[in-house]
């Protein structure tokens, strides 16, 4: 069943969707996606789809940018020693590379210092700053760090080493007294976009220093922006679009080497490539050891240097993947302990867990359990533990843990992620605070939500439509890749794939392939399912030069049949033994069956059902669609259906000749007693029901009169088509409905009967 709580995004008004679809010449579902993103007209669309540096904000709108630029230019002019102090993740490495290239282009020769994750830690380090000052550094420019470093920066500044802070992380209560603090959310600033990455801030500083956006570095800014999971909206979208285009068409030497080592063609690079190919490789440097080679790899012009470093990061990434798999398995086993299953949050700690990958492991545990999680490595001496936490949308991890800061040696982070160091004896207190916060933030442990953009029909599932969706890329925070609900009629060729059969491949309608990573266990369930809802993303697959649409499975729901098929041509009474409520449309049929059979539950007339009714059986045929619709407003699925119709009720409408035979009989027998209709039936070789229908039609068309019990023909009646009689039309509609209800395949019948129910389920 579902791993997620599906959450249908607000759907635009049909009129708005239609208008935008017509204006842009795009399918309605794409108009829905655009409207959900605030794109309401052609101008909005052009601005969203086509990147333009004119949509980048003035860098001097950032607080302290003028001070930062003045101090940096002064250092360059006076040939001061400058050190760029970066960070060991992708955002930090790309920020450092941007600042390095910018200062070099202005004639400076700065040093770059990337702290060691394990010995220096994140952000300003007092020993490192003292070393920098001792070795002659006169200006430190922090990139992707520093805003929380007042305890280190203030003494350094007071001792004569100037610091310019450029950062984007959570703002602490006390900011450092640096020469400048350039931050998009500075409390004294009013920059129009607060969600720049560290690389984005470095790019803005570079723009201010150079007088124009350094487009030669926009690829680096895009890498940091995408990898750091900041919102891909506003100018971040422009940076990401321009940067990805540069990587696709003119990749720098180091990135070309990474892509070659990974077997990825540059022209296919997109945000997914950054997230799953480039990003993990660069991050592996800092996670597994020294990240400084990352800056060299990103800035070198030498092919052999790039190739050697790319091979190194590839091997480190493989090693990192092995560690993650091992630790994640151990952590998930611990999560199954009774005390952890009962908890709303998890704090899992052990010796021997590599500190460089605990954040990734935490993400995997959150994904598997839906619980905010801290993964802590206990030092060899058992005294301290260091780790990372990841969270879910409903639980602000930083705020949850902030009251427990007194129990931590180091602590920092934001809504969805934190890093901390603490004494092992304080871990129970920290977890207790997590649980206390969960009591208010999380009433229950919810399934993680899966936003559904809209529902797609079979006709929407085309390669051309996938290409249209890609126009909305790059996808990420603030611009999520659309997930769609689809309801295939066919699930076939279900097969487990992968070395451990932990993935899945199957086909749906039109032979479209669906790939489900991590869904290998669902093979049997999907192969035998009668009704399935899929949550998917559209993708493409190229094999032997042929490109086709494929769907990526994000979740699925196997529905129990909402219509239980008890239809059969004869009734023997065995169908009525179940403890259900038996609903009849025809009171005469109800009376007849009650005389013939015993029922395991109550019987009722459909017209009398005026409240929700569960466990119902629809026994006979409704007289018309309105009667069926009326009862379906109250019948709760699953509902069993028999739709029995006695053969006498299902005889065909008389032919024109047979109608004529009845009319001639009545003309030959004026004043005929209607109680003797069986005599007419015998004379003209029709059933009694057919003759009754003919008389009703003749009466409605003024071909006969009926006074009391006597039927008399009208002399020289006006000619009227038989089909214009209400009785004729009603009989035709009844027979058509009966044909549908008795012969329609179960799945189609379910759709017909329960559209309202199934729609509300998908949207919930």
Region annotations inferred by a language model:
Residues 138-145, 614-621, 628:
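Acidic beta-strand-to-loop metal/phosphate-binding motif
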Residues 151-155, 361, 593-595, 627-634:
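A short acidic, amphipathic alpha-helical/loop segment
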Residues 87-88, 115-118, 145-146, 168-171, ...:
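Short, ordered loop/turn segments at secondary-structure junctions
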Residues 2, 14, 19-139, 159, ...:
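Hydrophobic helix-and-loop "lid/oligomerization" segment in the mid-to-C-terminal part
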Residues 104, 237-306, 310-328, 391-393, ...:
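Acidic, two-metal ion nucleic-acid-processing modules in DNA metabolism proteins
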Residues 177-227, 626, 630-634, 638-644, ...:
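Short alpha-helices
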Residues 1-19, 744, 749-754:
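Extreme N-terminal flexible tails
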Residues 130-208, 216, 233:
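Active-site cavity-forming subdomains of large catalytic enzyme subunits
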